[in-house]
Amino acid sequence: MRKTKIVCTIGPASESEEMIEKLINAGMNVARLNFSHGSHEEHKGRIDTIRKVAKRLDKIVAILLDTKGPEIRTHNMKDGIIELERGNEVIVSMNEVEGTPEKFSVTYENLINDVQVGSYILLDDGLIELQVKDIDHAKKEVKCDILNSGELKNKKGVNLPGVRVSLPGITEKDAEDIRFGIKENVDFIAASFVRRPSDVLEIREILEEQKANISVFPKIENQEGIDNIAEILEVSDGLMVARGDMGVEIPPEKVPMVQKDLIRQCNKLGKPVITATQMLDSMQRNPRATRAEASDVANAIYDGTDAVMLSGETAAGLYPEEAVKTMRNIAVSAEAAQDYKKLLSDRTKLVETSLVNAIGISVAHTALNLNVKAIVAATESGSTARTISKYRPHSDIIAVTPSEETARQCSIVWGVQPVVKKGRKSTDALLNNAVATAVETGRVTNGDLIIITAGVPTGETGTTNMMKIHLVGDEIANGQGIGRGSVVGTTLVAETVKDLEGKDLSDKVIVTNSIDETFVPYVEKALGLITEENGITSPSAIVGLEKGIPTVVGVEKAVKNISNNMLVTIDAAQGKIFEGYANVL
């Protein structure tokens, strides 16, 4: 199972039912809607399509609303475009004017108060660089030197690297978009241009007013956000490393180190993190990724990201399906190369000690040591699954939850496969329900060793405090085990020694009432022994112990109830017999 999650931006190239289906089948876990573009009507159409297709495919796909944010842009230019030439001067006005090579205006009136002589102003993703030469507060104009030439079109982005701006946390448009998202029951809000914890709290205030349970992922895109990351994470549910504007606001050579640090801080707190922007950028035009892009995606996974994101590749590119498949294949390959033992050791040192984390560590270590097939997390809020995920176990994590909302929010968490299953509230019912659901997914089958973890008493969120090692399978009989071995073989029911004569016993488990000295030559050739006679001093127990053969004695009605030629597993340590293959210790 692929563990790294894939976020796809839905746009003109991918909004059809046919393409949404292809993206889901290719590996999309979360659909991102960019509210910098499009109307509410257009986005509602996309939401309806995503949910319709996901329901038809019986897949869980979450929806992420990405706000436009309090960005700074230029106003319109004369004839839609102007040419700025290196060496010339240009005036940036706080009053709206039609842009010319001599003067243009910006949407942020306080820019004049935030910059100072020597500050840099970057236009159109940093393609044009200006340096402040003079500030005229009376005229509300900033005179700049043009450091490199370029064409400037309408409404292009403006960045102020190293400058602390006084923009609001969210705009009125953002607030309207968030209320729309609440109405449409989206799962995540990616908040653009977050600089301070108060920016996140403004969004939370809107969510609390509407009693909406939507996770907030701030996008860190500037130096101020980087500087305040610890405080921002305290009030956030996760994080997006938005490398596009970040690479303009800070020197590009610093972005990889900042990415690693942001991911590490999220890993420490067990909060999901998305790495975004230009991951497979060339696939907007080409059907194959570059080697550098493949390395970029893999390194983000090695850094510890929960999810990787596609932007223009799926929103407007020529090869949206191929981009998702490429992302999936890179993720699977990178995960296969991970040293999960070292990863667990590193995470154990990184994450702070607490009661909940102690259970998480125990589950992860036990899963590694016993090589369990899956970890089944029964969870109301998703907290149990996230607790396990932070330790990056090699085993699959199956999150069984009664809530569709929780299942969708688990779609962003590394290694977690969410499954919706209603169930009763008692602890026994919860555990049985979790095991049955895990089997239904096809991820585990009879004979697999799994770990079940949950919080008890049931129904309370954030109380992960229980771990149980469980063997999936049908126990057909039990008695007193002799020795600590286990064996898998085909039964041969022998009411008398004559039933054993002339038989190849090399793959057989002998089932009989009792044995005497005439049975011994046959028993020592067999894989295992099951008898009805009781006691550790019985002939069956003594022979089994002397010959080193896994044996279970005292099994009631063994000859009657255990069929001939049945594949069974003997677990002598527990005195149990399972039908079929069972991965016993």
Swiss-Prot record:
Binding site for substrate: 32, 244-245, 277
SUPFAM superfamilies for this protein: Phosphoenolpyruvate/pyruvate domain, Phosphohistidine domain, PK beta-barrel domain-like, PK C-terminal domain-like
GO molecular-function term, one example from the UniProt record: magnesium ion binding
Record-marked site positions (Transition state stabilizer): 219
Pfam family, one: PK
Protein's UniProt keywords contain Ribosomal protein: no
Record field: catalytic activity: pyruvate + ATP = phosphoenolpyruvate + ADP + H(+)
Positions annotated to bind Mg(2+): 221, 245
Enzyme class: transferase
Binding residue positions for ATP: 34-37, 73, 156
Cofactor: Mg(2+); K(+)
UniProt keywords, alphabetically: ATP-binding, Glycolysis, Kinase, Magnesium, Metal-binding, Nucleotide-binding, Potassium, Pyruvate, Transferase
InterPro entries noted in UniProt: PEP-util_enz_mobile_dom (IPR008279), Phosphohistidine_dom_sf (IPR036637), Pyr_Knase (IPR001697), Pyrv/PenolPyrv_kinase-like_dom (IPR015813), Pyrv_kinase-like_dom_sf (IPR040442), Pyrv_Knase-like_insert_dom_sf (IPR011037), Pyrv_Knase_brl (IPR015793), Pyrv_Knase_C (IPR015795)
Residue sites binding K(+) per the record: 34, 36, 66-67
EC number from the UniProt entry: 2.7.1.40
Pathway the protein acts in: Carbohydrate degradation; glycolysis; pyruvate from D-glyceraldehyde 3-phosphate: step 5/5
NCBIfam families: PRK05826.1 (NF004491), PRK06354.1 (NF004978), pyruv_kin (TIGR01064)
Family to which the UniProt record says this protein belongs: Belongs to the pyruvate kinase family. In the C-terminal section; belongs to the PEP-utilizing enzyme family.
The protein, known as: Pyruvate kinase
Origin species: Staphylococcus aureus (strain bovine RF122 / ET3-1)
